[in-house]
Amino acid sequence: MPAPFKTEAVVLRSIRYGEADRILHLYSEDRGRIGAIAKGVRRVKSRMGGRLEPLSRVALILREGRGDLHTVTGADTVDAHPWLRERRESLDRATQACDAVLRLLDSSDPNRPAYNLLCHELQLLDREPAAATRAQALAFRMKLLLAAGFAPELAACAACGEREHLGAFSASAGGIVCPGCEAGSFPLSAEAHEYLVGALVRPLADHPAASERALAQVDRAIGETLEHHAHVRLRRVA
């Protein structure tokens, strides 16, 4: 029988399976994406059931599976994020964050920056009701792009290297572009450009502010970057 292993993970999604089990999609600290089955957790007397809810951060003991599905044999709560579950806006933003990680990071290779980013996002949404904003959610996505290796070029034209007159964005080129390279691009305001740069370098809790018009451009830039380079389509941030 395979030896059990321990890891810490965030529950991204939970799906009912059979009469009493659940299939879990997890993102772990040291093993990347993990699929697992938690047997019997939907029974009333199960001690693990309440610890394996989506958005929870948990310390797990798992038994190695033959394929991609491991078996949960033990679970302890690290952070259940109880307060964000009481606020619709916070819950929606947290669910969006977990969905983005689920769709973008499908490898079993560990990505500690991405894991730490997700944990920070959930903790922030749990503790700060005012954090559940469009601007903050887009800042998380920009940082996730960076952690996944898909951050766009923002310092110079992604096509030719020009550093002035940068007023458009092209996902196919890889970022911001100059007038001479703007075929297939869309206009990007200076405010939206500043937001994109600031979102990468500033802490999540201190994300840049921007108008709704600029945030719409940011959302489009992130979405098109994901679609073109990662072949992932996420629901736009409203």
Model-identified regions with their sequence ranges:
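Non-catalytic alpha-helical scaffolds and adjoining flexible linkers that form interface surfaces
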Residues: 1-238
